[in-house]
Amino acid sequence: MMTEAERASIAADGTDGLLGKRGKGVFHIHTLGCQMNVHDSERIAGVLEANGYVPATEDQINDNDLDLLVLNTCAVRENAAERMYGTIGRFNRVKLVRPNLQIAVGGCMAQLDRKKIADTAPWVSAVFGTKNIEDLPKLLDQNRATGKAQVQVTEQLRQFPSQLPAARASRISSWVAISVGCNNTCTFCIVPTTRGKEKDRRPGDILDEIRQCVADGAKEVTLLGQNVNSFGYGIGDRYAFSKLLRACGTIDGLERVRFTSPHPAAFTDDVIAAMAETPNIMHQLHFPLQSGSDRILRAMRRSYRSAKFLDILGRIRAAMPDAQISTDIIVGFPGETEEDFQQTMDVVRQARFSSAFTFIYSPRPGTPAAAMEQIPRDVVQDRFDRLVALQEQITEENLATFEGRDVEVMITGKLGKKDTDTHRVTGREKTGVLVHIGVPEGEPVPEIGDFVTATVTHAGRHNLLADPDVAAGQTYSVRH
């Protein structure tokens, strides 16, 4: 794995450095799906770099000047499979121009559909799963030697992906997986099939990784798991997750900690207290509802009901009045009636989520819900549109409450030309809301990773604007 210093040296050396020599090949990873896939893509990149491959520059990506394309796939929704095959088809068009290009497909769809991928797309060089990322370099070598597609997908996890080298996409924000897999049996979900049963990492290993991230320059980490708050249940410690959160609060230099995704059934008061009492745990929570109908929740095998869900939200907000809580909602689950849908709308009105990821139900082969009677598409679309309209209204009303308030924003991402021309920087405030900040005239532009405290002057539909008038007493300050 290359260090930041080595990357900088390569960039400075140009054609005389490793990029000029191309190593074993120049690669690019295209990632579909969730945050866990983003985490895994960083591990795929780390494994490739450790084996002599070189990450592509932006110009090389734009020019298709590549020796290896890796697709890390998602299997959560039906259109994810369609996107995968569409992307593989686009990769083939690149291969027609660059015959020596290798194409590798990994992730959840590879775990699920390995043979079909190889049969449908004979131009694919290697297929690997979620549990054997470390095998990719060997599969690529075998493909080069034999000219035949290499398919290797294992069912048992040999080691946590987090134990593999990582080439992190961000210098200041890091993903840290605390577990893999899921022990729940939701009737709509394919994740237990593709990721397996839940396995937890040792708390000491997790904390060591976080400390290393901070030593490497990270100011923020996001703890990842399919059900983070059931962490430790397998060894009989139901307080393990809240202990982990509190331990994060003892790490010097770690400014912000987030986590995703918890399961409402296991969201207990000790976790709420840890969030409220640990200064660097952000008051941001993604809390999947899925449906507000108890009948549908039962059919989904979600082990909570709407009253319990709302009760937990009430306890969270009592402890953290500033908490921003987002959710997932599925519309059109098999058997959903208009009455069921209205119950979901009622819960959304009461919960007042900061935002919602709303999905039209899509059957996943092999899940119990796929065999149930489906609802006509036009009915589902109408319900979906009504739910989105309601949530958009709530989101706008919520963002409007930020106007006139001072927020601390961590500057993230690259500054584009538009931002430079308008003298703006972008980042997220503590509860995760996106904020665009106008830098006052005469002030230097903050660097990525700086913290800017500024007065919010306008609330948009999905973000905030801070154009502070310092002369009028509004706030603008920078902390490095």
UniProtKB/Swiss-Prot annotation:
[4Fe-4S] cluster 1 binds at C34, C74, C108. Its EC number is 2.8.4.3. Its main location: cytoplasm. It catalyses: N(6)-dimethylallyladenosine(37) in tRNA + (sulfur carrier)-SH + AH2 + 2 S-adenosyl-L-methionine = 2-methylsulfanyl-N(6)-dimethylallyladenosine(37) in tRNA + (sulfur carrier)-H + 5'-deoxyadenosine + L-methionine + A + S-adenosyl-L-homocysteine + 2 H(+). CDD domains: Radical_SAM. Binds 2 [4Fe-4S] clusters. One cluster is coordinated with 3 cysteines and an exchangeable S-adenosyl-L-methionine. Catalyzes the methylthiolation of N6-(dimethylallyl)adenosine (i(6)A), leading to the formation of 2-methylthio-N6-(dimethylallyl)adenosine (ms(2)i(6)A) at position 37 in tRNAs that read codons beginning with uridine. This is tRNA-2-methylthio-N(6)-dimethylallyladenosine synthase. The gene is miaB.
